[in-house]
Design a protein with these regions (language model features):
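Alpha/beta enzyme core
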Residues: 2-132, 136-147, 174
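Extended, intrinsically disordered, low-complexity segments
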Residues: 135-179
Length: 179
């Protein structure tokens, strides 16, 4: 099963927290969602994380106030999305890190300053995610690969950056699947 479930206060349609144009539901509505999730949970091993996107919509103080209200519901972790400065990151940690795990979301090119997991841990964050980093790395590689293929009409210039057929099969476990 799921180890943790994230419930957020964004309105529909959902947007990435680092994009503009978001809205947030009223605090009481979000508290109702959190209480319902906490009441419905069948195992204490399933954690409930409350996420707020209020910073972009209502400002840092509203985001902190919402996080405080969500903490009061009894959630297991907090996520204040798209903290924009090191000062805001520290403010969130100062207010919450000694009471509940905080999640830091590192999006390359997003709103939050990128820091290493160890730096974030020293600051007070206990959960760090780098969502989409693999997709951005793969997209960058694909741009280079297809650009090279279009120019040279062959994969030869790109071969040193590729796995060959046998290497790929070893990586994905094809020999074990065929036995």
């Amino acid at each position: 099963g799921a180890a943790m479930i994230q419930i957020e206060d964004q309105t529909f349609p959902k947007r990435c927290g680092h994009l503009d144009g978001k809205g947030v539901v009223p605090v009481a509505e979000m508290q109702g969602k959190l209480k319902a999730a906490l009441d419905a949970r069948q195992s204490s091993n399933t954690l409930i994380l409350a996420r707020t996107d209020a910073l972009a919509v209502e400002g840092i103080q509203s985001a902190l106030d919402r996080a405080e209200a969500y903490l009061a519901c009894g959630v297991d972790a907090l996520f204040i999305e798209a903290l924009r400065t090191p000062d805001q990151m520290q403010q969130a940690c100062d207010q919450f890190a000694h009471r509940i795990p905080l999640l830091a979301n590192m999006v390359e090119g997003g709103q939050t300053p990128i820091q290493s997991a160890s730096e974030l841990g020293e600051r007070g964050f206990r959960i760090v995610i780098f969502p989409g980093g693999t997709a951005r790395a793969v997209a960058h590689s694909l741009q280079g690969y297809y650009g090279s293929l279009q120019m040279s009409q062959t994969t030869t210039p790109w071969r040193d950056k590729m796995l060959n057929f046998d290497e790929l099969n070893q990586l994905i476990g094809t020999p074990e699947l065929l036995t």
